[in-house]
Swiss-Prot record:
Protein name (Swiss-Prot/TrEMBL): Large ribosomal subunit protein bL21
Biological process terms in GO annotation: translation
Summary of subunit composition and partner proteins: Part of the 50S ribosomal subunit. Contacts protein L20.
Family in the record: Belongs to the bacterial ribosomal protein bL21 family.
Protein source organism: Paracidovorax citrulli (strain AAC00-1) (Acidovorax citrulli)
One Pfam family cited in the UniProt record for this chain: Ribosomal_L21p
GO cellular component, one term: ribonucleoprotein complex
Taxonomic lineage: Bacteria, Pseudomonadati, Pseudomonadota, Betaproteobacteria, Burkholderiales
Function recorded in the entry: This protein binds to 23S rRNA in the presence of protein L20.
Keywords from the UniProt entry: Ribonucleoprotein, Ribosomal protein, RNA-binding, rRNA-binding
Length: 103
């Protein structure tokens, strides 16, 4: 069984037992969270698509860790004007262990 969930402005296809990295969630490590924004639920050949959400469907997940992604380097330059700007960014994430999918 799998589900398509929405969290942090992004959509993820998840199945029971998977680990995924999502945008940072304000929850402690080891805490169990319930994601109720389920866009679709599938089981083999059967697919249930919500309009926009599947009513009554939830996905439970456990917070495994918090961290930062690799650094993304930004470099801006104007040719012949002696202008260079360097900047870096590390996006924070939360790693989730997907538990039960209830439709």
């Amino acid at each position: 069984m799998y589900a398509v969930i929405k969290t942090g402005g992004k959509q993820y296809r998840v199945a029971s037992g998977e680990k995924i990295k999502v945008e940072q969630i304000a929850a402690d490590v080891g805490q169990e969270i319930v994601i109720d924004q389920v866009l679709a639920v599938g089981n083999g050949a059967e697919l249930k698509v919500g309009t926009p959400l599947v009513s009554g469907a939830t996905v439970t997940a456990t917070v495994v860790a918090h961290g930062k992604h690799d650094k993304v380097r930004i470099f801006k330059m104007r040719r012949r004007k002696h202008y260079q700007k360097r900047q870096g960014h590390r996006q924070q994430f939360t790693e989730l262990q997907i538990g039960a999918i209830a439709a």
